[in-house]
């Protein structure tokens, strides 16, 4: 995250101290908000981190869930039960050599479907959060193009605006 801070600071996209950046990260990723946004009855029960790294189920559909470590842990704990992860396949879209891959995948989780998902595999959650944060700050609501291990990639981020503040709504490769 220090490199993300340095990048954003060097390019004038974040002007505070490292402590300010930590507080900003905590707020955009971990502060809870109402994902429905417009509901008459506000239910605070989601965060950017939960959506992107852990996943959510609503109306029998999986949303978010773009982290391979969480996917692996849930798949491992399923032990073939009908609840948990039912992995239906993947396609490697980009390969970063020994540093991981970018895949698209299809699966069910506790009976809910993820018809099309994408995630990095073999990368650290810290790297993923750093890349997503950079894209959120620099290219919010736009496609963020960059290279990872000399391989061109695209990351998409969406904001969730509540209480006059932009939180991470989602982020994915």
Features from the language model and the residues they span:
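A cross-kingdom marker for long, charged
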Residues: 141-173
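N-terminal "domain-start" segment
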Residues: 1-147
């Amino acid at each position: 995250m220090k490199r993300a801070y340095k990048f954003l600071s060097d390019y004038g996209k974040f002007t505070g101290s490292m402590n300010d950046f930590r507080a900003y990260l905590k707020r955009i990723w971990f502060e809870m908000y109402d994902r429905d946004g417009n509901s008459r009855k506000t239910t605070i029960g989601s965060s950017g981190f939960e959506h992107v790294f852990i996943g959510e189920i609503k109306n029998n559909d999986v949303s978010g869930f773009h982290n391979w470590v969480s996917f692996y842990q849930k798949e491992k704990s399923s032990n073939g039960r009908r609840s948990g992860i039912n992995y239906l396949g993947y396609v490697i879209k980009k390969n970063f050599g020994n540093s991981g891959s970018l895949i698209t995948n299809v699966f069910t989780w506790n009976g809910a479907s993820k018809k099309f998902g994408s995630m990095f595999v073999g990368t650290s959650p810290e790297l993923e959060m750093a890349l997503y944060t950079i894209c959120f700050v620099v290219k919010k609501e736009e496609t963020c193009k960059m290279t990872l291990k000399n391989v061109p990639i695209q990351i998409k981020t969406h904001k969730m605006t509540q209480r006059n503040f932009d939180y991470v709504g989602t982020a994915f490769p």
